[in-house]
């Protein structure tokens, strides 16, 4: 983000930094005695100031995490996070909650493994229960060449210090006997398992980062939509919002699928496309799927939530869109793959589906 941002640890926003109540079993017992009526707000609802050292557009996982680490690691707390809707209303609250680092390429593997290590210490770090559940992620293989490719991936992972296990069909059957092992078209040959992968409560991730950033002086401003970016001689000096102009020295963009629209306000054309990715949840079932299972013969992945619903998804919709809704042919496509992997899904009712907007780079790598 550059130098000369002041490095102020305590905020100078015309009000004192609020003390953070540390969540613990003792605070839980204390508030139980008062009927849970004296819990302080997890974060403030401040009015926008005239200017900040840093403004971050997007109050989702990436935007809130950026603000949190700026304040915690770099001592830069004169920061505002601008969210056009409510906090966590975008992709951080719309995904299928899977965390993993089972990648192969040199650029991807260390990047996602660093992320996995952050997940493993995240709850202690920001003192919030994000319900990180390292229940394992299993990718199925259905052909001999695919099994060889998984062996190659697993070896690459282990060279980089990432856990990986190559399982044969019998070991997979022991773990998940309800899979269709006798499917003549897609016989299960085995799979690659990362035991440290799993799921996390996505809303709690946003809440935890928001609480941690707010306690360090960051202003989290909801219902504040950026409508323009002001530049002077090619340098960003602030943003125009539906709540007035806000000046800044540095501007961060964490708007996910709307990144191209926001960047265009500053005259930038990003080399990305925006696509809808749908997700689904079923009716509640008894404990059924212990971990995360992905289909190797089609794009389908499924896990089970703490409420018993099966959370699953598949391919992105093939057309470009900024709308957070998908189309019915993709619903059929995803569930078709799910039933091919788990025939019992045919008898399960789907409660609802929703969509999130993916900002897709041409090579699948972050910019």
Task: For the regions a language model picked out, list residue spans one by one.
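Extreme N-terminal leader/targeting segments of oxidoreductases
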Residues: 18-54, 69-77
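Glycine-rich FAD pyrophosphate-binding loop
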Residues: 71-92
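Dinucleotide-binding Rossmann-like beta1-alpha1 core, especially the glycine-rich loop
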Residues: 96-178, 299, 329, 337-339
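Short beta-strand to alpha-helix junction loop
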Residues: 110-113, 140-149, 192-211, 221, ...
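Helical element adjacent to the flavin cofactor pocket in flavoenzyme catalytic cores
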Residues: 191-250
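Central helical "cap/lid" subdomain
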Residues: 241-290
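Active-site lid/adjacent beta-loop-alpha segment flanking the redox-cofactor pocket in flavoenzymes
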Residues: 284-367
């Amino acid at each position: 983000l550059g130098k000369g941002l002041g490095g102020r640890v305590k905020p100078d926003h015309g009000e004192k930094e609020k003390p953070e109540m540390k969540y613990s079993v003792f605070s839980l017992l204390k508030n139980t005695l008062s009927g849970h009526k004296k819990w302080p707000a997890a974060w403030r609802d401040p009015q926008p100031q005239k200017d900040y050292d840093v403004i971050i557009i997007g109050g989702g996982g990436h935007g809130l995490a950026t603000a949190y680490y700026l304040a915690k690691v770099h001592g830069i707390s004169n920061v505002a996070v601008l969210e056009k809707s409510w906090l966590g209303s975008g992709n951080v609250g719309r995904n299928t909650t899977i965390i993993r680092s089972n990648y192969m390429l040199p650029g991807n593997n260390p990047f996602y493994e660093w992320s996995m290590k952050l997940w493993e210490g995240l709850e202690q770090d920001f003192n919030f229960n994000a319900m990180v559940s390292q229940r394992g992620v299993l990718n199925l293989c259905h052909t001999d060449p695919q099994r060889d490719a998984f062996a190659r991936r697993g070896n690459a992972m282990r060279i980089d210090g990432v856990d990986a296990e190559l399982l044969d069909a019998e070991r997979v059957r022991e773990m998940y006997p309800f899979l269709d092992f006798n499917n003549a078209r897609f016989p299960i040959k085995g799979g690659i398992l990362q035991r440290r992968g799993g799921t996390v409560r996505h809303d709690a991730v946003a809440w935890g980062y928001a609480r941690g950033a707010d306690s360090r002086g960051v202003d989290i401003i909801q219902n504040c939509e950026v409508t323009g970016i002001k530049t002077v001689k090619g340098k960003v000096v602030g943003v125009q919002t539906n709540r007035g102009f806000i000046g800044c020295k540095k501007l961060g963009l964490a708007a996910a699928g709307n990144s191209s629209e926001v960047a265009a306000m500053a005259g930038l054309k990003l080399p990305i496309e925006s696509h809808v990715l749908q997700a689904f949840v079923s009716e509640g079932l008894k404990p059924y799927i212990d971990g995360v299972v992905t289909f190797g013969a089609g794009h389908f992945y499924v896990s089970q939530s703490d409420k018993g619903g099966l959370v699953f998804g598949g391919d992105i919709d093939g057309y470009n869109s900024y709308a957070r809704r998908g189309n019915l042919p993709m619903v059929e496509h995803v569930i078709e793959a799910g039933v091919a992997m788990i025939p019992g899904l045919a008898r399960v009712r789907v409660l609802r589906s929703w969509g999130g907007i993916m900002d897709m780079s041409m090579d699948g790598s972050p910019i």
